[in-house]
From Swiss-Prot:
This is DNA replication and repair protein RecF. One of its GO terms (biological process) is DNA synthesis involved in DNA repair. GO terms for cellular component: cytoplasm. The keyword Secreted does not apply. ATP binds at residues 30-37. Keywords: ATP-binding, Cytoplasm, DNA damage, DNA repair, DNA replication, DNA-binding, Nucleotide-binding, SOS response. The gene is recF. One of its GO terms (molecular function) is ATP binding. It comes from the Bacteria. PANTHER family: DNA REPLICATION AND REPAIR PROTEIN RECF. It is found in: Cytoplasm. It comes from Corynebacterium jeikeium (strain K411). The keyword DNA damage applies. Its main location: cytoplasm. NCBIfam families: recf.
């Protein structure tokens, strides 16, 4: 897959941009703060419906405007599709494929695929579990687009279950974990409230287990498929370092281990386990029942994929806290490259985006990275200064300076104004 055209209007610093792209390597060069990252961020947003830099869509809309537009034409095995997204500072976004309106922006998932690495990815190694869950979920919805709706439904059900645990805490505590027969001493009204809350909690348990099981099973499959690519790419980037490995860890690991399923594997050469949705659902449902007194007491959901994590192992130690700065960078970059090679194996090769990456790598790692990306159909790179561009790329890459792109956009806008004036005459 490659992107042949990218158009932006009122997206962050870009009032207008109409960019023709081709397979191969394209580099956007310019000082920090001048808009080069905004270009690749926009393409990444179209692919994943989220930004790697901010959580709020409002930040993506140019100051003083209400709507930002992103359009990209993707070419996959000779077939062209154009994805268009109107991002609203307030209200719901609007999506089109070619000229057809979509019911949801989630319908765009899979039209454009990207693997984006940026300095923020260091948080994959050093940050909190939420960062690693987000990494897996971005791959999940690209690989299995229908699970985007499952994830949204899970998040909604989780909020409602937590609200029930908080709002009905008094009634639930009277019956959950209480001695047998104690409910006989309760008034009819309180007993009715407690029974209603319990029945509703049972419903949310079932929904959360069914939805969460699909997410867990997909994540475990992704980790299983990523692990060998991670080992290979890390070995290529840092041949003198310890071997890298990854495994999935869940809040129901103990229950799964009782069934003979051990997700957490710390040895680099051992394959990670798989988990079927059916087993995950049954195990989650039983775990909810066992954990109910603690959840009622604390007023929150203690089990499920929203609390899971990924073990990132370097040698025999966790990468978090034990990896050096250089090893952490290489590990984070290897995770992104592993995702690229895995998706290539699936039959749909994503566009590789490297946002200000080479500035953080020594000459040896730069060359290893160039070797790894040389076979990709399309690579988009940003660099703040020319010195950050590896020599091996200078003769083969198309290099745009941000000033060139801004001047081109300005000329296009001026022509449009003149054409409008001519039409008025």
């Amino acid at each position: 897959m490659y992107v042949s055209n990218l158009r932006l209007s009122n997206y962050r610093s870009w009032e207008e941009l109409d960019l023709q792209l081709s397979p191969g390597i394209t580099i956007f060069s310019g000082p920090n703060g001048h808009g080069k990252t905004n270009i690749v961020e926009a393409l990444g947003y179209l692919a994943h419906l989220s930004s790697h830099r901010v959580n709020s869509d409002a930040a993506l809309v140019r100051r003083g405007e209400e709507i930002a537009n992103i359009s990209a034409t993707a070419v996959n095995n000779g077939r062209e599709l154009t994805a268009h997204l109107a991002i609203r500072a307030r209200g719901s976004n609007r999506a089109h494929i070619n000229r057809a309106a979509m019911n949801s922006q989630r319908d765009l998932l899979g039209v454009v695929r990207t693997t984006l690495f940026s300095p923020e990815d260091l948080a994959l190694i050093r940050g909190e579990p939420e960062q690693r869950r987000h990494f897996l979920d971005a791959i999940m919805v690209a690989r299995y687009p229908r699970l985007a709706a499952v994830k949204a439904d899970y998040d909604k059900a989780l909020r409602q279950r937590n609200a029930l645990l908080r709002q009905s805490a008094f009634a639930l505590r009277l019956v959950v974990g209480a001695p047998k027969g104690a409910s006989h001493n309760l008034s009819e009204d309180i007993k009715a409230d407690a029974e209603s809350a319990l029945a509703t909690l049972d419903v949310w348990d079932s929904q959360l287990a069914a939805l969460g099981a699909q997410i867990m099973s997909a994540r475990v499959q992704i980790v299983h498929d990523l692990a060998p690519h991670l080992q290979q790419t890390y070995q290529s980037l840092a041949p003198q370092s310890r071997p890298a490995h990854m495994s999935y860890t869940s809040t129901i690991d103990v229950e799964l281990a009782d069934l003979g399923i051990r997700l957490g594997v710390s040895e680099p050469n051992q394959p990670t386990a798989l988990l079927s949705p059916e087993i995950a659902e049954a195990t989650l449902l039983q775990a909810f029942a066992n954990k109910r007194p603690q959840e009622v007491e604390r007023g929150t959901t203690l089990l499920g994929p929203h609390r899971d994590d990924v073990n990132l192992i370097l040698g025999h130690q966790p990468a978090k806290g034990y990896a050096s700065h250089g090893e952490s960078w290489s590990f984070a970059l290897s995770l992104r490259l592993a995702a690229f090679f895995m998706q290539r194996g699936d039959g749909v090769e994503p566009v590789v985006i490297l946002d200000d990456v080479f500035a953080e790598l020594d000459s040896s790692r730069r060359q290893h990275l160039v070797d790894l990306i040389s076979s990709a159909e399309q690579v988009l790179i940003t660099a703040a200064v020319d010195e950050d561009i590896p020599e091996a790329l200078r003769d083969v890459a198309k290099i745009y300076t941000i000033d060139e792109l801004k001047n081109s956009a300005l000329s296009t806008a001026e022509r449009a104004v003149k054409d409008g004036e001519a039409d008025g005459d």
